[in-house]
Amino acid sequence: MKAVLIPGDGIGREIAESVRAVSAALNTGIEWQECEAGAEYAEVSGELIAPGTLDAIEACGWALKGPTATPIGKGFRSINVQLRQRFATYANLRPVHTLSGVPTRFENVDLVIVRENTEDLYKGIEYMLTDDIANGVKLITRPACEKICRFAFDYARKNGRKKVTAVHKANIMKLTDGLFLRTFREVAEDYPDIEANDCIIDALCMKLVQRPEQFDVLVAPNLYGDIISDLCAGLVGGLGFAPSANIGDKTRIYEAVHGSAPDIAGQDKANPSAILMAFAMMLNDLGMTDKADKLNAAIQAQVAEGKVITADIGGTAGTKEFTQAVIARL
């Protein structure tokens, strides 16, 4: 089968090579079509996303993407957001769990974040009323709320999860977050076998850093989902172990949660675990469950051993050396 591989910016090309090497070692049979998108591509072409990239994703329906840079406070819109909206990948799935060998404050984190991926403040509707007043629109619709909440409950049921928690700020944003919460409660009635509750976003952040084990599946509007994803990654050792999947009806785009890390780009220092774990998510969805399990087990065993590991978790190994060590375990 064919799948699109987008290296992206910064460390993207290095960790994309890790994916290629692992894919070959697992004999997945995937034929990678490398396509361009990102700030580095824009510097030479004047375009953020190559025209052929969109066509390739649409044709394949499957893509694995490296990190892409986004300027802060000015410049172009996030490429991630553009791709999610272009291909209607309405659900962003981000599993978070403790790995043996990674120094953290917690030993029993095992939760999943389900983030609405297409609207909220990330819709990008903002403008200047005057030189001194900026306005942004928080767009929340019932169809999108129902779709993401139903996805969360379906995921919980399929994967043996027992509880789904809605994340909101409906005590203040009574119309927008209120609509999300009301829709969540309506959908929950169709899943009597799954416990449903809700938590205000600021209280949730406190509870996550106190007792993360009390949570199972978290479903959230776009902005809150983005924020708690990084928070939860911090609970298990950082963004180096945070994969994600952008899921639509016709298209799936997998990626690491972390950024392009330009400060270490080209130095063979990046931890490829997150994108390899995202690749494992892709393999699982493709029906290659045994290969996905082997890859996850190899990563976990390599990290747990604590010898050939990257600098972000206290080691000295480079990207290539760590990748080869994982491959040796396959």
Label each region the model flagged.
Residues 2-8, 63-67, 164-170, 278-284:
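Short glycine-rich or small-residue beta-strand-to-loop segments that form or flank ligand, phosphate
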Residues 43-135, 223:
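N-terminal glycine-rich phosphate/adenylate-binding segment common to multiple enzyme folds
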Residues 4-26, 130-202, 214:
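Glycine-rich phosphate/diphosphate-binding loop of Rossmann-like nucleotide-binding domains
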